[in-house]
């Protein structure tokens, strides 16, 4: 790939140089353009009299619209997530196209990367210009923001690997008061409360409602914790489920469907985790919902070079190191910032490989939500096995009085079977609007007075 965009630092900070590309017409926001539907882009392209519109892919359409708009006197503001290539230069990839390389990517020169201390995963926003003669990509002219903050702050950040991890001590509010039909997030609050920095596994056999449960968790997080940056990562999923998730979740939804190669699954996961790490370095709270960790581990197993040592089920001995590093990145950070990862692990699929992957990940999380096939077969949702689900160090997330009531609840339902336990709890929750109201109902008449 030949890249010829070469701007010196002096040029890039020179007002006269920037004014040469200053807007005479409209400002075009590249991010908003990429969010448009293909039909809207086609209509816009036809207005600009671009030829062969129907034969162009979405990214090619965006590129053509930008180029034509600049010719007519417009200027462009762009944003994307940086991927630094081995040659030293980088490109801003877009979450709207799942960080896939395309003609509408924005080129960043090595001098800009060095000057601002940029790394893979940084979210960069700035003014961009159209490609000159002999160039293939739009180029970044001026950096306005790095990770939604002033670029100067990027100098003083501490590397993610040097940050001190702690147990989660601030609870993620998952309880939705207005949700009278679905009690899944209220049940999670009672049996396995989540905190900022949690590393949680949803252990799920097929057809137990794990994807719907993830959607409910995502909805609860965005409603109750607006300060949290939410990313939903779908690996090896069906395209219709991706569309459903994009339409139901207010957050960043990125996906690599089952018809894409394993290398694409891995590249997407690496971009997402690097982006999350850079945001945590800026003391932000990030939540990643992964569906599914098992399929991600399968993808790593496919792309990793063979070590010659193969475990049971066909898993290479070195294959699980990188997915473990992905999952292990979840942590609560001392002095601000946290990365929470809630991932689904598939079991009872009939694949020995999936069982081996689950066993490897079993002890790495600090919270587990176990879904039961027998409960789901009775069409009871959420199909959570209460006795087998729980969170480590939950005393740091809830106060002592509530914790004692949670323990009393566990003692009451322990003699019951898994189906009877969740049915009993759901019937009680139906009569109350909040979990606090539910705990009040648990009190004896003497305690209520």
Curated annotation (Swiss-Prot):
Molecular function GO terms recorded = ATP binding; ATP hydrolysis activity; ATP-dependent activity, acting on RNA; helicase activity; RNA binding
Gene3D superfamilies assigned: 1.10.720.10, Nucleic acid-binding proteins, P-loop containing nucleotide triphosphate hydrolases
Coiled-coil positions are none
Q: Does the keyword Hydrolase apply?
A: yes
Name the Gene Ontology biological process terms: DNA-templated transcription termination
Q: What is its EC number?
A: 3.6.4.-
InterPro entries in alphabetical order? AAA+_ATPase (IPR003593), ATPase_F1/V1/A1_a/bsu_nucl-bd (IPR000194), CSD (IPR011129), NA-bd_OB-fold (IPR012340), P-loop_NTPase (IPR027417), Rho-like_N (IPR011112), Rho_factor_ATP-bd (IPR041703), Rho_N_sf (IPR036269)
Q: Where is the Rho RNA-BD domain?
A: 75-150
Give the enzyme class: hydrolase
Composition skew (Polar residues), residue ranges: 1-17
Q: Which key words are in the record?
A: ATP-binding, Helicase, Hydrolase, Nucleotide-binding, RNA-binding, Transcription, Transcription regulation, Transcription termination
* Region named Disordered: 1-20
Tell me which residues bind ATP.
195-200, 207-212, 238
List, alphabetically, the GO terms of the cellular component aspect. cytosol
- Domain of life the protein comes from: Bacteria
Subunit details for this protein?
Homohexamer. The homohexamer assembles into an open ring structure.
Its family remark reads: Belongs to the Rho family.
| PANTHER family registered for this protein in UniProt | TRANSCRIPTION TERMINATION FACTOR RHO (PTHR46425:SF1)
Q: What does this protein do?
A: Facilitates transcription termination by a mechanism that involves Rho binding to the nascent RNA, activation of Rho's RNA-dependent ATPase activity, and release of the mRNA from the DNA template.
Indicate what this protein is called per its UniProt record. Answer: Transcription termination factor Rho
Origin species, per record, is Rickettsia bellii (strain RML369-C)
- Please state the gene responsible for encoding this protein: rho
């Amino acid at each position: 790939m030949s890249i010829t965009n070469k701007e010196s630092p002096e040029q890039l900070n020179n007002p006269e140089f920037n004014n040469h590309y200053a807007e005479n017409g409209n400002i075009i926001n590249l991010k908003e353009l990429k969010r448009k539907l293909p039909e809207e882009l086609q209509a816009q392209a036809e207005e600009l009299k671009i030829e062969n519109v129907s034969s162009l892919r979405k990214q090619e359409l965006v590129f053509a619209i930008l180029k034509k708009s600049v010719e007519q006197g417009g200027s462009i503001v762009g944003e994307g997530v940086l991927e630094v290539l081995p040659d030293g230069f980088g490109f801003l990839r877009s979450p709207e196209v799942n960080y896939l390389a395309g003609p509408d990517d924005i080129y960043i020169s090595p001098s800009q990367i060095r000057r601002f201390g940029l790394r893979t995963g940084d979210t960069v926003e700035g003014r961009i210009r159209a490609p000159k003669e002999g160039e293939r990509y739009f180029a970044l002219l001026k950096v306005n923001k790095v990770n939604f903050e002033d670029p100067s702050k990027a100098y003083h950040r501490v590397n993610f690997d040097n940050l001190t991890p702690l147990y989660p001590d601030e609870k993620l509010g998952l309880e939705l008061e207005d949700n009278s039909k679905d009690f899944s997030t209220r049940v999670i609050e009672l049996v396995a409360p989540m905190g900022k920095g949690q590393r949680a596994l949803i252990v799920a056999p097929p057809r137990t409602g794990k994807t719907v449960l993830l959607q409910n968790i995502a909805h609860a997080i965005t409603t109750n914790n607006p300060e949290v940056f939410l990313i939903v990562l779908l690996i090896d999923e069906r395209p219709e489920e991706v569309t459903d998730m994009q339409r139901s979740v207010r957050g960043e939804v990125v996906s690599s469907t089952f018809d894409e190669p394993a290398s694409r699954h891995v590249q997407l996961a690496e971009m997402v985790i690097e982006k999350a790490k850079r945001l945590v370095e800026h003391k932000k709270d990030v939540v990643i919902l992964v569906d599914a960790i098992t399929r991600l581990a399968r993808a790593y197993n496919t792309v990793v070079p063979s070590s010659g040592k193969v475990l049971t089920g066909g898993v290479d001995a070195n294959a699980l190191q990188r997915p473990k590093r992905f999952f292990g990145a979840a942590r609560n950070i001392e002095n601000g910032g946290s990365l929470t990862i809630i991932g689904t692990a598939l079991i009872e699929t009939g694949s020995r490989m999936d069982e081996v992957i689950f066993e490897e990940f079993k002890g790495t999380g600090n919270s587990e939500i176990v879904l039961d096939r027998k409960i789901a077969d009775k069409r009871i949702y959420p199909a959570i096995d209460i006795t087998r689900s729980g969170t480590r160090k939950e005393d740091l997330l809830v106060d002592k009085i509530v914790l004692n009531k949670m323990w009393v609840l566990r003692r009451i339902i322990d003699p019951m079977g898994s189906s009877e336990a969740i049915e009993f709890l759901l019937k009680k929750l139906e009569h109350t609007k909040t979990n606090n109201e539910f705990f009040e109902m648990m009190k004896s008449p003497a305690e209520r007075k």
